[in-house]
């Protein structure tokens, strides 16, 4: 009995070490699903343009209007088009998974305690329509938590298709997230 009592702390320590060494801590589940959004970190010191924002109007899965400082947009409203992806339509002509993608985006941003918008370069760039800025959307889900990249989450959960994914700063990880969504047959796939 005394030997068992002495072994218990050792066994407990080994069990805890094995649990923390498992994929869950590294952002990988037992079935091999990788949380790429947990792996990608917001670098506030990089040369890309960044600004804090709050949601003004949620439009759909890949378009949101944000309130931003007037130094970013003269009227204080940045009409954002998410970089690297295209979600199915949820307004006008409703497409399969469009409403689900829209709800996913709305839910993540509504519960965020902080939102940072990031350009893919050192200045804000317009999309092909000329009416929206192309952005990476980072949100902090709770106080003290790391920021998560919403664009990447939409891709890894199968709510979006790739759109000019390889032509941006996070192209490689976006491609990996999209491949995984296909492998796991998530939503659109």
Regions found by a protein language model. Name each.
Residues 5-17:
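Sec-dependent N-terminal signal peptides
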Residues 1-3:
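N-terminal secretory signal peptides that target proteins for export/translocation
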Residues 9, 19-189:
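Small beta-barrel nucleic-acid-binding modules, primarily SNase/OB-fold domains
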């Amino acid at each position: 009995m005394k030997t068992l009592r002495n072994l218990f702390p050792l066994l407990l320590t080994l069990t805890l070490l094995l649990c923390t060494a498992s994929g869950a801590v590294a952002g990988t589940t037992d079935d091999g699903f990788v949380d790429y959004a947990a792996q990608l970190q917001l670098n506030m010191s990089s040369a890309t343009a960044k600004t804090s924002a709050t949601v003004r109007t949620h439009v759909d899965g890949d378009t949101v209007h944000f309130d931003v400082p007037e130094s970013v947009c003269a009227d204080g409203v940045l009409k954002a088009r998410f970089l690297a992806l295209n979600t199915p339509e949820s307004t006008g002509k409703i497409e399969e998974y469009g409403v689900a993608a829209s709800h996913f985006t709305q839910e993540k941003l509504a519960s965020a305690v902080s939102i940072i918008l990031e350009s893919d370069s050192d200045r804000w760039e317009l999309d092909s329509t000329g009416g929206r800025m192309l952005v990476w959307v980072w949100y902090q889900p709770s106080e003290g938590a790391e920021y998560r990249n919403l664009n990447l989450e939409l891709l890894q959960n199968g709510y979006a298709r790739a759109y000019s994914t390889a032509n941006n700063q996070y192209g490689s990880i976006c491609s990996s997230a999209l491949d995984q969504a296909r492998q796991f047959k998530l939503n659109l796939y």
